[in-house]
């Protein structure tokens, strides 16, 4: 049995197969996921698992180079936004790199998400709780 945080086999597989600049989406329960993107559906019920909890587990195993979020999160979901930025700041310190965060309109976010290797659907029921994480290399 694995001894790291991430126990979900499918999600662990997708993270392990990411190459430089490949992306992974972590999204709330309502984001439309393209049929061309592999889906890892973790949602059990409203709020379970939560978006931030899922992000923290994923970034414990993924080297992140940069991230994309919808502009709307700043106004419509400031608590999630601030906690997300805090998690990314801590990850930057751990990894020894600067993780750039790009803000785009939600409609553009949906287009970009359709280019990801996989999308992780959480049980999050708050608006714009979505992020695209782009894989970097730890060297």
Swiss-Prot record:
Pathway(s) annotated for this protein in UniProt: Carbohydrate metabolism; D-ribose degradation; D-ribose 5-phosphate from beta-D-ribopyranose: step 1/2
Enumerate the residues binding substrate. Answer: 28, 106, 128-130
Presence of keyword Oxidoreductase: no
Transmembrane region(s): none
Keywords associated with the record: Carbohydrate metabolism, Cytoplasm, Isomerase
Active-site residues from the entry: 20 (proton donor)
Q: What does this protein do?
A: Catalyzes the interconversion of beta-pyran and beta-furan forms of D-ribose.
Family, as annotated: Belongs to the RbsD / FucU family. RbsD subfamily.
Q: What is this protein called?
A: D-ribose pyranase
Organism of derivation: Histophilus somni (strain 2336) (Haemophilus somnus)
Could you read off the lineage of the organism from its UniProt record? Answer: Bacteria, Pseudomonadati, Pseudomonadota, Gammaproteobacteria, Pasteurellales
